Amino acid sequence: AYKGAIIPHLVAQELMSLNTRKSVKPIFWVREKNQSSAEVDLVVQFNKMVIPVEIKSGKEGKLKSLHQFIEAAPHPYAVRMYSGKFSIEEHKTKTDKKYFLMNMPYYLSTKLYDYLDYFVSNFK
């Protein structure tokens, strides 16, 4: 019952623990529109990009909000933290914008920036 709230909290805590010099609060993205809204669980700064991170409590889950973020982003990178295996997939949004999705198991959350370095360097 609490899985949907606990997992994002734990992942955010793991990422916050990486910043030992200053207190960093987790940042999320919200798009509010009259008839619909969208929310991405976390956004992280990597190089000069803001990368969306969706945190799912299981192996499955829709990525509708992530697609809306990617539509507005000047880069093709997104991350999903979930209970599955590591993989990188190529996807398209509804408007056919191509992007790359890096799927990471929760236990790798403290290695996010190392994996982002590999991800951004090798997928263009």
Residue ranges and their predicted role:
Residues A1-K124:
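A cross-kingdom feature that marks ATP-driven nucleic-acid transaction machinery
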